[in-house]
Amino acid sequence: MSAPSGGGEGGGKESAAGGVSSSSLAPSSLPPPRPKSPPEYPDLYGKRREAARVQMLEREIGFLEGEIKFIEGVQPASRCIKEVSDFVVANSDPLIPAQRKSRRSFRFWKWLCGPCLSLVSFCCCCQSKCSCHLRKPKCCNCTSCSCIGSKCCDGSCCSNICCCPRLSCPSCSCFRGCWCSCPDMSCCIPSCFRSCSCTRPSCLNKKKSSCCSCNCKIRWSSCFSCPKVRLCSCCFCNCKNLCSNPCCLAF
C-alpha cells in the first residue's frame, strides 16, 4: 500500500513539474514583438512638391484659356469707335451754327489786322527832315513846338535846339532860355532845363527861406554839391536851408 502512495506522490510531483514547465514555455511560444510600421520616407528629391506645382500651373493655364476664348468672342473696340465717329460725322450737331466757317475767317482777319492797325496808329512823322518812326512815351507833340525850323521830337529825331512839352502835359510851356511855368515839374522834358531857373512845386506856397531853389547850368554833370541828392542829372544846387525833399529836380 506504500508503493501506490509513493507512486502517487511521484506522479503528483511530475504533474506539478510538468505544469511549471508548461507555464514557463508558454511565453516563449508567442510571436516576438514587432515595431510599428515606420513613417513614410521623406520627399528627398521634392517630387511631390513639383507635382503640386504642376497641378497649380495646369489649373491656371485652364483659366487663361477660358479667358482667351471669351475675349475672342468680344467685338474689337476700334470697330465701335469707328462706328461712333461715322455716326457723328453723318449727323451734325444741331447746337453748332451753320455759319461757323465764316466766323473763323472773320476772327483770323481780325487777329491779323488788329496789331497792324495798332502799329500804324502809333506812327508819326515830324517835319520833312524827320523820318517816320514809332512814338515813344517821351516823344513830344510836334505841332505845339514854337521853335521855328528845328526838329522837335525828343528821343529818335530830336535836337536840343527845341524844347517841347510831353503829351501828358499840354499846359506845360518849356522853351529854351525861358522860365518853366509847368504846374508839375515832372511834366517837362529834362532837356528843357539847361538854361532856366526853376523852383520845386512843393516850395511854391512856402517862404523862400524854408525851401531850396535850383539854378540850372549848361552842364548836366555839375550838380553834386547838394548833400541830400546823389542822382542829380541837370542842376547845380544852392541851398540855404535843407528841405525834407531833395532840392534838385530828379527825372
Swiss-Prot record:
Bias (Low complexity): 14-28
Keyword Nucleotide-binding: no
Prosegment location in residue numbers: 249-251
GO biological process: response to abscisic acid; signal transduction
Tissue distribution: Expressed in flowers and siliques.
Role of this protein: Guanine nucleotide-binding proteins (G proteins) are involved as a modulator or transducer in various transmembrane signaling systems. The beta and gamma chains are required for the GTPase activity, for replacement of GDP by GTP, and for G protein-effector interaction.
Protein's UniProt name: Guanine nucleotide-binding protein subunit gamma 3
